[in-house]
A protein has these predicted regions:
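Helix-to-loop junction immediately C-terminal to a conserved catalytic motif
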Residues: 55
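Pre-Walker A (P-loop) beta-loop-beta motif of ABC nucleotide-binding domains
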Residues: 27-38, 92
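The feature captures the beta-strand-to-loop junction immediately N-terminal to the Walker
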Residues: 40-42
């Protein structure tokens, strides 16, 4: 089946079973041409299985996978215009960097001179031209990763799959490579599909993110939407840090939901479709959207007591106990210019929130 489309990849009702275990359950999504798309989720959620199905390393039990409208199920990996960068870069230790990058091109029938010319072009693109004569063992981890990227980009694939390629790098290099990968994707115009369990990687690089759990896509959207408007409790808890409070919805009026939690505390937030008056649900409150004061600043300020302050570099995380209520966390910038003050343990304070900070969740 073929149909004209601008979608680089379409996954249509894809199911993957291993015996009696279902690894993917009716997954459907589309990935646009020239998009940086990330599959994000914990270990065992099905993200790598889906990536391997797109690459052709795993068969689809049910459903289909389409590349620019053409079904590719049954097409072997080497006949798909798709390349993969794995966690293990799998560079040939006896070959130079230039030969490693050009090897795949020669296997595709390019002459040695053509392969070397193209290899030189992509090495320049990833800023490794000066290392072309070196062996992989003479390179750092970050340089080896860029060689693997260059090798995957050399044949000009329509789609590049990246299976947690940054996981072996140290934090500082990983952050630098996140920016470099994003720039490289825009420069080449190739669709990137990136797999990771790291929320920061996903939010930093991606045009859109599919958050996965238990073989299903829990939410699909851009970074801001995923973070600020999580669809359910799993997404809110998995993406970043949040306070999850069990609340009862008392009433809904003019698009606002009035809720109460333990200890007589009351909070108001935007109403959410599917959650009506009387519902017992969870509310998400991001710590960085809360601030502390010595006196209430609004009618719904929550009285609490500081238990502990944790210094984490640029921020300070404060753990609080609400009066007759749950534990709370507030995150403040480690700067005198920040909105939230930092109080000593044992101090009675009030927790205040920015408008829009609270989000009701469909459990």
């Amino acid at each position: 089946m073929t149909r004209k489309t601008n979608d680089a990849i379409e996954v249509r009702n894809a199911v993957k079973r291993y015996g009696t275990f279902t690894a993917l359950k009716q997954v459907s999504l589309t990935i646009s041409d020239n998009e940086f798309f990330t599959l994000l989720g914990p270990s065992g959620c099905g993200k790598t299985t889906l990536l391997r199905m797109i690459a052709g390393f795993e068969d689809v039990t049910e459903g289909g996978i389409f590349l620019f409208g053409e079904e590719i199920e049954g097409l072997p990996p080497h006949k798909r215009p798709i390349n993969t960068v794995f966690q293990n870069y799998a560079l040939f230790p006896h070959m130079t960097v230039l030969d490693n990058v050009g090897f795949g091109l020669e296997m595709l029938g390019k002459s040695k001179s053509e392969a070397r010319k193209r290899a030189g072009e992509v090495l320049e693109m990833v800023q490794l031209s000066q290392f072309s004569a070196r062996k992989p063992s003479q390179l750092s981890g970050g340089q080896q990763q860029r060689v693997a990227l260059a090798r995957a980009l050399a044949p000009r694939p329509k789609v590049l799959l990246l299976d947690e390629p940054l996981s072996a790098l140290d934090l500082k290099l990983r952050k630098a490579m996140q920016i470099e990968l994003k720039h490289l994707q825009k420069e080449t115009g190739i669709t990137f599909i990136f797999v990771t369990h790291d929320q920061e990687e996903a939010l930093t690089m991606s045009d859109r993110v599919a958050v996965m759990s238990a073989g299903e896509v829990q939410q699909l959207g851009d970074a801001r939407e995923i973070y600020e408007r999580p669809r359910n409790m799993f997404v809110a808890d998995f993406i970043g840090e949040t306070n999850l409070l069990e609340v009862t919805v008392d009433q809904i009026d003019a698009g606002r939901a009035a809720c109460h939690l333990g200890g007589g505390h009351r909070l108001t937030c935007d109403a959410v479709d599917g959650i009506g008056a009387g519902a017992r649900v969870h509310m998400s409150l991001r710590p960085e959207r809360l601030f502390l004061s010595s006196a209430p600043t609004e009618s719904e300020s929550l009285k609490a007591r500081v238990r502990e302050n944790i210094f984490i570099g640029t921020d300070i995380s404060t753990i609080l106990d609400l009066d007759d209520g749950p534990e709370f966390r507030v995150r403040a910038s480690n700067s005198s210019r920040g909105t939230s003050r930092v109080f000593d343990p044992g101090t009675e304070v009030f927790v205040n929130m920015e408008r829009g900070a609270a989000r009701l969740l469909v459990d």
